[in-house]
Every structure is written in structure tokens, then in C-alpha cells.
Amino acid sequence: MSMAEERVIKIGMLGLGTVGTGVYKVLKSQQEEMLPKLGARVELKKILVRNVEKAAAKVDDPSIITTSFEEIANDPEIEIVVEVMGGKQPAMNYILACLDAGKNVVTANKDLVASEGKKILAAAKRNGKDFLYEASVAGGIPIIRPLYECLMGEQIQEITGILNGTTNFILTKMDKEGASFDAVLKEAQELGYAERNSEADVEGYDACRKIAILSSLISGQQVDFEDIYCEGITEITVEDMKYAKAMGTTIKLLASSRRYAGNRLHAIVAPCMLYPDHPLYNVCLLYTSPS
């Protein structure tokens, strides 16, 4: 295919914070790698921000920066919108407006997907567009699309996984090195593996939102993460780890959801003792894994 015939996929992005800046850099640096896979060149046409001056310093071409959402929503050339704003609003309204405008939407916003996923998916279906949220669950592990494909042929009865890398890092270090929770959390923060305010991770809220998304998917109904029993790892001590090791087990923070008759669900996030024959026993440090 000649350069004249080369197809261009034009993208709009909502937000240019930490995640958005990362997406921008990937799109800029991976053009050659993406071209043979997509059969097209990707062009980031517009980025919606609040602070133009701050955002302009992060990009090569400041003309792609805008404070007007309508510039993205009303641009017929923009086929895909990447939402990296975070939070529920105005992200929710923007996503719905983009779908109604005939654009496909990609997000990693697990808070929004967990609470409003059903409504957004309905809007996507109504408009014949894709709403993709693979990155909102289990990071780099492609779990959402395989679940969709499995659901076409059969019903999934149960899903269990380690869905938060920060807590798994902490528990692995506590298990292998005999370190305290506070000491490992501090190390994780210094290494950039954990936020300064790590409540969402260590209290299990992040994993809870993710299992809510997966529960909604396997059941076909909206599952609110507030309705799921959630217990984090802040109360786990060095003594607990020694006790688990003496029993030939290790402690992992598991998120689990199981379907019962009548499409009833039981979902839970809690620390569990696993024996070596458990498929998640050897998932260590920052790795996450569904099973």
C-alpha cells in the first residue's frame, strides 16, 4: 500500500494526566510497530484538557490541545475516543455523547465501568459502536474479550483472580522476606508501585471494582461494587504469614464471583490461604491473574 493510499485512524483523547501522557507517548513512539498490525496509521487529532498551558508543554504540537469537548464529539474524522480522565463525571456524559456521535470508545476507568458499565454498554449497542474497557481489569491481561467470546457459547459459573498488583507485591514480600506490612508498603511507594494514598489498593477497593465489572459481565446484570463484601490486607501481620507458611500455604488477596441458580451471585474480596496446588499460588509480586 502506498503512502497515498495509507489509511489513517484519527483518535481523540479525553485527558492528559499521567495515564493520558503515557498513551500519547505510546501512540507517538509505536507508529511503525502499529502500522503492519492495524493496516493503518494512527493520528491523535485532538486532546481535551482543562489547562492548555500545562498540557501544551507535554506534546510536540500544541494545536492538538483543546478545552472544547465539542471539537472532538462533533468531528466526523475522529473514529475512536480514548477516555483517560478518570472519575465518573464528566467522563460518563462525554462517553455517552461520543457513542451517540458514532464513535468507538476505549477506557481504563474502572470506577465508571463498575458503576455505570451496563448503561454505557447499552448505549454502545444502540449506536452499533464498541465500548472497550479491557485495561480496567487485570492490567495487561486480556480477560474481557475472552469472557465475551466464552459467553457466546456457554455460561461461566465462577471466576476467581488476583486483580491488584500492589497488594500482591506486598503479600509476596511479606511471605518471602518476613517483612511487615508497613515496611513493604513504604518500599512499594518508594519504588512507584503504590500510590502515596494506597487505600484503594490495600483495603481491597480496587480489586472489588474489578470483580464487580467481571461479575456484571458473566451475569448480564449490573453488579455494584458497594454490594460486594470487601476485606483488604491491612490487618495481615508477620505472624499471620509465619502461621500460613507453617501450614504449607501462602496468603493472597482473591476476588471471586460465583453464579447460582436463578442468576444469583456471590462475590467477595478477601485474603485467602492457598496451598501449592492452587493455580494462583505462584502468582508473585506485581503480577495479576484470573482463573
Predicted feature locations:
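Conserved small/polar residues in nucleotide/adenosyl-binding loops
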Residues: Y287-S291
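ADP-ribose/adenylate-binding Rossmann-like module
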Residues: L99-S115
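N-terminal glycine-/serine-/threonine-rich beta1-alpha1-beta2 phosphate-ribose binding loop
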Residues: S2-A101
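Rossmann-fold NAD(P)-binding glycine/threonine-rich loop
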Residues: K110-F131
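Substrate-binding/catalytic subdomain of NAD(P)-dependent oxidoreductase enzymes
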Residues: V184-Y281, L286
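Rossmann-like NAD(P)H-binding beta-loop-alpha module
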Residues: L132-A194, Y205-D206
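Short, ordered loop/turn segments at secondary-structure junctions
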Residues: R50-V52, K110-L112, K118, S136-A138
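Short catalytic-loop micro-motif centered on adjacent basic/acidic residues
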Residues: V82-E83, V105-A108, F131-E134, E158
